A protein has these predicted regions:
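His/Asp/Glu-rich mid-to-C-terminal helical/loop segments that flank catalytic regions of hydrolases
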Residues: 232-249, 277-281, 326-333, 341, ...
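Active-site metal-coordination/substrate-binding segment of hydrolases
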Residues: 58-134, 138-140, 145-156, 322-325, ...
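Zn-dependent metallopeptidase/amidohydrolase metal-coordination segment
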Residues: 344, 351-364, 429-485
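Active-site-adjacent substrate-binding region
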Residues: 241-257, 409-452
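Midchain, well-structured core segments that form catalytic/ion-binding scaffolds
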Residues: 94-99, 103, 139, 147-372
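A short beta-alpha structural unit
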Residues: 10-14, 273, 307-318, 357, ...
Length: 490
């Protein structure tokens, strides 16, 4: 596969770049600029800005910013040994798709960087003055965009290269906010756990205890914005639904519960370890089999590789106190997840959603991460309060992140008209103009540079934020040609 964009992307895949750990990729970008004689500055946040002068004949044209983010979501399959802080991403070609071996690919947004770098190092491409803005930590906090200083950017037009849909131009995005909850507790021993009589169970332990592990795996997961309305299962929900189902039937002692990983990814895997009375041994398997059948009926058409496993396991030494464990399960059941409302203005666009992203056992507490999105600011805040109220049923600490603004669509954008015409001239078809239910950095750029005229484009990708991520090779080639045609036309 000989192509300048993919040659650059191949080099980027060798550089570790987890969110909040962009030191190596920031340095790589600066070295790239130096080696090509390109003006380059890096700010305190490690954002990198490259500046390329206009080519002959374009000196009096308004400049443009090409923008992408450095970091990538680091997800891997449970059976894959990969250290994202050290190991390169191993890629392979499957037909017309570029994929990674058991991990996220990092096409989001490594391919955006690659297209921008290919464009500014193409000596045959005529263009106005170009600024390349490469930001850090887009995936877990939009930190780079938030810390971008006033006055760093000179141009009034910006093309964001962080979209994932072929032949589509995005002119707006949702705002978002995170809700984080913690339930602190003092672990108890097996004997203490059994002696704690909460009054919430109907059957007493008899004949000893049976330790079992519940595990959900093989789910699609995906982006908590783009994929939230696709009917995919959330592994965290499946675990707590089953626990809530059997809790009234017997004495349960919950030893551990873990699921999900990143706030902007739908949970693909989750597990819980618990004990039940030995007398409940057969019944829990019956209940599990019924539950599996029900979940296959609900999600089977979408989740083709869903696995729900129950197995006996070794007894753990400590447990969550019974009353707290019960309240935790009920709070998680009450916590909303998924699509909440569709846009009335733009058919097919999710307006409001929330993601029950992760449940993590820490020393002395359980941490729950969620994220809320909406293109309507009031709806975003109403939803964060609903999540807070649900989690407060169990958690003694609930906090919210700073949040980030949405990007209001401007259908009369002059830049939009240029980008649309470039597409039509190349492909003899009309591109779709849409807004996206995901957080792009554009909303934050507008806060600092309210005069910016912006659009977002990108090649076709599926399964982003999951090990199923794949990037269309022909779509990438089309998108790069489209970008080049746009630069010629500006």
């Amino acid at each position: 596969m000989k192509n300048k964009v993919f040659d650059i992307f191949s080099e980027i895949c060798k550089v570790p770049r987890p969110s909040k750990h962009e030191e190596q990729i920031s340095r790589w970008l600066q070295d790239f600029a130096v080696s090509h004689g390109i003006e380059c500055v890096a700010d305190e946040a490690m954002n990198v800005i490259m500046r390329v002068p206009a080519t002959p004949g374009y000196e009096d044209h308004e400049g443009v910013i090409l923008q992408a983010h450095m970091d990538m979501v680091c997800e891997k399959n449970g059976d894959v040994q990969h250290d994202f802080m050290r190991d390169p991403i191993e890629t392979y070609i499957d037909g017309e798709w570029l994929k990674a071996k058991g991990t996220t690919l990092g096409g989001d947004d490594g391919i955006g960087i690659s297209m921008a770098l290919a464009a500014i190092t193409d000596s045959d491409l005529p263009h106005p003055a170009i600024e390349c803005l490469f930001t850090v930590d887009e995936e877990t906090g939009l930190t780079g965009a938030m810390k971008l200083q006033d006055g760093m950017l000179r141009s009034k037009r910006l093309i964001n290269l962080d979209s994932e849909d072929d032949g589509q131009i995005f002119i707006g995005c949702a705002g978002g906010i995170d809700t984080l909850a913690k339930m602190h507790y003092e672990p108890v021993s097996v004997s203490e756990a059994v002696c704690q009589r909460s009054g919430l169970c109907s059957v007493s332990p008899q004949g000893g205890l049976l330790a079992v592990k519940l595990r959900v795996s093989g789910l699609l997961g995906g982006h908590s914005g783009d994929d939230i309305n696709k009917g995919r299962a959330n592994a965290n929900q499946l675990i707590v639904w089953f626990l809530a189902r059997i809790w009234p039937q017997t004495d349960i002692q919950l030893a551990s519960i873990n699921g999900g990983n990143l706030r902007n990814a739908i949970a693909r895997e989750a597990e819980a370890v618990l004990t039940v009375p030995m007398s409940y041994k057969e019944q829990i398997r019956i209940e599990w089999n019924h539950f599996v059948a029900q979940m296959e009926g609900v999600f089977g058409e979408v989740e083709k590789d869903m696995r729900l496993d129950l197995e006996t396991c070794d007894m753990l030494d400590t447990f969550i106190p019974s009353d707290k464990a019960y309240r935790l399960v009920m709070a998680l059941c009450e916590c909303p997840h998924g699509m909440i409302a569709m846009s009335k203005e733009m058919p097919g666009l999710v307006e409001t959603s929330t993601n029950l992203a992760s449940i993590k056992m820490k020393e002395g507490y359980i941490e729950i991460n969620t994220s809320q999105r909406s293109s309507i600011e009031a709806s975003k805040h109403h939803l964060k309060w609903a999540v807070e109220q649900a989690l407060s049923l169990a958690c003694d600490e609930v906090t919210h992140g700073d949040g980030y603004p949405g990007w209001a669509p401007n259908p009369n954008s002059p830049l939009l008209e240029v980008v649309k015409k470039a597409y039509t001239d190349l492909f003899k078809a009309e591109p779709k103009v849409l807004a996206i239910h995901a957080g792009l950095e554009c909303g934050l750029f507008l806060e600092k540079y309210p005069y910016l005229d912006m659009v977002s484009i990108g090649p076709q990708m599926y399964g982003v934020h999951s090990p199923q991520e794949r990037l269309s090779i022909p779509s990438t080639e089309r998108c790069y040609n489209w970008l080049c045609q746009t630069l010629k036309s500006l």
